[in-house]
Amino acid sequence: MEEYIMVLDQGSTRSKCILFDKKGEVLGESEREVEPIYPKLGWMEYNPVNIWASQFSVTTELLAKYNISIEKIASIGITNQRETVLVWDKRTGIPVYNAIAWQCRRTVEISEELNKKGYGKVIKEKTGLVLDPYFSATKIKWILDNVEGARKEAERGNLAFGTMDSWLIWNLTKGEKHMTDYSNASRTMLFNIHTLQWDEELLEIFQIPKSMLPEVGPSSHVYGHTDSILFGKEVPIGGVAGDQNSSLFGQTAFEEGAAKNTYGTGCFMLMNTGNKPINSQKGLITTIAWGLDGEVTYALEGSVFMAGEGINWIKDNLRMIDSLEDAEEYALSVEDTNNVYMVPAFGGLGAPYWNPEAKGVVIGLTRGSKKEHFIRAVIESLAYQSYDVLKAMEEDSGIVLKNLRVDGQYSVNNFLMQFQSDILNCKVEKPKNILNIAGLGAAYFAGLAVGFWKNKEDILKNNGIEKEFNSSIDDRRRKVLVEGWKEAIKRTI
């Protein structure tokens, strides 16, 4: 009897496998760290062979650990770090170069050159995206232009490109399927989110041969089956979505205007805008949330590049804390930051500013500043950056947010969640499974594709809020705090 959905969750720092039951509860999980490669300052890569090896190993480990027969797996879901991209040889399955990470800034010059030529407008109109090194297209172009023989082989039709989901599907099916879903395709800067097709003009702008492109399908859809040699049985791959999009679905943000914010290395806020895309005028991006039941759902998104990375920085580089728990303890030991603000723009600024040249800034230091003030300012920076995104989102959508669902590694910090509610002046809701929400969304997509869950109403039965936070400060105090943050941003830009 098929009792579980198995999810492959390939993230920026680890590869993970999770088993979910029909109630959306986690039966078990297994994970392995993935090691980023930093060839030069501002560059970031992954070894794609190691990515696949780590993802496959945690899958077999999990099944063995809980003594789960593959016969009990109804479907496999995939969720992945978005924009990170690689190119491989279709004939051998061997990558021609490492996967270039979404955080990598090596293509700043390519982006600037294309912007100078005036391509930013048409790219925004067709893809909903800002012409920035963050997205996949400039990374693919870089590989074709800089890896010896790559462009020639691509023009001969011998190379394929894909985001992490495509790479996993290729390996799970032993090269039988080269596919992606709408949500991941919409992050490449090559996919027209209105026609739902790869766009010829965009391919021409970035000089990428059409033969490299994966087939695109809905997020909930049987993409194919795993090769029987892997698990001893063919298992349907029923769900695929980028991690932030999957998180929105896992939060059951099915209604127009529903929003979530994920607190990880970066912060990613998405708002469901229904079946029509909203063209942002406030520095956000328009993206495809998911494809389901013959329809496409769109979203507004604010992507903050460096959020929790600021906390990692004070832990790993400055050695101020030993753990996330330490950070919260220090923050609560003082009443405020004593007017210290910190902007962690280590890799430029994302939404809503989109300034790749911005650098990190600390303002307000005095002789009375303590370590505790600085640590608190770093934590508060996550909430302030999310404030900037949410205000832009409200202006674009015309919707004033009453509550915000949260998830991700740093959402366990209750001080941060309370401060977020204070600054936004809205309810913050922390659901169950906050560390596996993206995985849960992928499980829902995979389960819906094979009838494990009948429909979205069936899924809503699994909903549950673990903790709520409500604003505890007045408008006057909120205004003073936000004005200080705005001054810090001015110094950054």
From Swiss-Prot:
Activity regulation, free text: Activated by phosphorylation and inhibited by fructose 1,6-bisphosphate (FBP).
Keywords: ATP-binding, Glycerol metabolism, Kinase, Nucleotide-binding, Transferase
Domain of life where this protein originates: Bacteria
UniProt keyword NAD present: no
A cellular-component GO term for this protein: cytosol
MF-aspect GO terms: ATP binding; glycerol kinase activity
Pathway in which this enzyme or protein is active: Polyol metabolism; glycerol degradation via glycerol kinase pathway; sn-glycerol 3-phosphate from glycerol: step 1/1
E.C. designation(s): 2.7.1.30
ATP-binding among keywords: yes
Binding positions for ATP per the UniProt entry: 12-13, 265, 308, 312
SUPFAM superfamilies xref list: Actin-like ATPase domain
Positions annotated to bind glycerol: 82-83, 134, 243-244
GO biological process: glycerol catabolic process; glycerol metabolic process; glycerol-3-phosphate metabolic process
PROSITE patterns per record: FGGY_KINASES_1, FGGY_KINASES_2
Enzyme class (EC, first level): transferase
Chain sites annotated for binding sn-glycerol 3-phosphate: 12, 82-83, 134, 243
Catalytic activity: glycerol + ATP = sn-glycerol 3-phosphate + ADP + H(+)
Residues that, per the record, bind ADP: 12, 16, 265, 308, 413
Family of the protein in this entry: Belongs to the FGGY kinase family.
Subunit (UniProt): Homotetramer and homodimer (in equilibrium).
Role summary: Key enzyme in the regulation of glycerol uptake and metabolism. Catalyzes the phosphorylation of glycerol to yield sn-glycerol 3-phosphate.
Protein name: Glycerol kinase 2
Record lineage: Bacteria, Bacillati, Bacillota, Clostridia, Eubacteriales
